[in-house]
Curated annotation (Swiss-Prot):
InterPro entries: Ribosomal_bL32, Ribosomal_bL32_bact, Ribosomal_zn-bd. Belongs to the bacterial ribosomal protein bL32 family. The gene is rpmF. Keywords: Ribonucleoprotein, Ribosomal protein. The lineage of its organism: Bacteria, Bacillati, Bacillota, Bacilli, Lactobacillales. This is Large ribosomal subunit protein bL32. SUPFAM superfamilies: Zn-binding ribosomal proteins. The keyword Ribonucleoprotein applies. One of its GO terms (molecular function) is structural constituent of ribosome. One of its GO terms (biological process) is translation.
Length: 60
C-alpha cells in the first residue's frame, strides 16, 4: 500500500485548496425580453443577440 512519506500540514493542505472555489455565473440583462440570461446562450424566450432564434417552451 502507498503511504505518504510525511504528514501534510494544515497550511500546505489549505494552500493547495485555495483554488477550489465556485464562481458566480455571468448574467446579463436582455433588453429585448426584459429578462436576465447567461452570456452566449439562448434566453428562455428563445432570443439570442436580440433576434428570435428558437421557439420557446410553453407551459401547459
Amino acid at each position: 500500500m502507498a503511504v505518504p512519506a510525511r504528514h501534510t500540514s494544515k497550511a500546505k493542505k489549505n494552500k493547495r485548496r485555495t483554488h477550489y472555489k465556485l464562481t458566480a455565473p455571468s448574467v446579463k440583462f436582455d433588453e429585448t425580453t426584459g429578462d436576465y440570461s447567461r452570456s452566449h446562450r439562448v434566453s428562455l424566450k428563445g432570443y439570442y443577440k436580440g433576434r428570435k432564434i428558437a421557439k420557446a417552451n410553453e407551459a401547459k
